[in-house]
């Protein structure tokens, strides 16, 4: 049986690992997952990440905690394979009144909603993180 939504699997693995207080989480790698991990690292939600280019490429993400609680309080898939969500610049979501971020896939690459607004481009809303 093949996996239909690999990004939803990535977010679920992160949530489950944080609930179990793991220091890191591993998953099958892809370019999109690596781009999302890079954005999460830039925003301070996760520590470093690495891609092991073995027979099966594996992405390992180091999770961050603050005072014993996970830094990522909530991570939700917005656009899914059955219902894609594309937004223009003015319609990009503000997560938790600007305290969180939305990760957007644009023609210029994967970036946060703030960076997309600053660049004046819209795209597919992949997920929201708070």
Curated annotation (Swiss-Prot):
Q: Which GO terms fall under biological process for this protein? A: translation
One short Pfam name that applies is Ribosomal_S8
For this protein, the record's SUPFAM superfamilies field holds: Ribosomal protein S8 (SSF56047)
Keyword line: Ribonucleoprotein, Ribosomal protein, RNA-binding, rRNA-binding
What cellular-component terms does GO give this entry? ribonucleoprotein complex; ribosome
- Entry's Gene Ontology molecular function annotations: rRNA binding; structural constituent of ribosome
Q: Does the keyword RNA-binding apply?
A: yes
Signal peptide residues on this chain, from the entry's feature table: none
Function description: One of the primary rRNA binding proteins, it binds directly to 16S rRNA central domain where it helps coordinate assembly of the platform of the 30S subunit.
Indicate the family of this protein.
Answer: Belongs to the universal ribosomal protein uS8 family.
Subunit comment: Part of the 30S ribosomal subunit. Contacts proteins S5 and S12.
Name the record gives this protein: Small ribosomal subunit protein uS8
Report the gene name. Answer: rpsH
